[in-house]
Amino acid sequence: MRLNTLSPAEGSKHASKRLGRGIGSGLGKTGGRGHKGQKSRSGGGVRRGFEGGQMPLYRRLPKFGFTSRKAMVTAEIRLSEIALIEGDVIDLNVLKAANVIGPQIEFAKVMLSGEINRAVTLRGLRVSKGARAAIEAAGGKIEE
């Protein structure tokens, strides 16, 4: 088998419609667009959500909520992810270096998900009650 002999399986690819190539093709003249009207024109058609002039659903429903800007720079970290990181002291920079969190993250909270079997020191991270208990049970400590 060579790259130049590869071809798709028989019947897996349909030939593209060749529009405007004579009456006999079935797609000549109007090219499957019918006669006149907005959808037959070049660039014709209505935008997404358009309901023929009726007040569209996205305008009938009220606005609600907002996107918290703090949520964009905050991350949740699982205890199982902490267990995989080398080193005894773990802070925000160590998490970024290990690609556990993105470079734009400014705050992180460690949650109880998974388990940890070695003593680690968390520095400058928020910690949930369950995660705090698990870290201290493993002999680790949390520094503010």
UniProtKB/Swiss-Prot annotation:
Biased composition (Gly residues): 21-31
Gene Ontology molecular function: rRNA binding; structural constituent of ribosome
Pfam families membership: Ribosomal_L27A
Region (Disordered): 1-53
Gene3D superfamilies: 3.100.10.10
Keyword rRNA-binding: yes
Keyword list, A-Z: Ribonucleoprotein, Ribosomal protein, RNA-binding, rRNA-binding
Biological process, per Gene Ontology: translation
Protein's UniProt keywords contain NAD: no
Domain of life: Bacteria
Function: Binds to the 23S rRNA.
Assembly and interaction partners: Part of the 50S ribosomal subunit.
Name of the protein described by the UniProt record: Large ribosomal subunit protein uL15
Organism in which the protein naturally occurs: Edwardsiella ictaluri (strain 93-146)
Gene: rplO
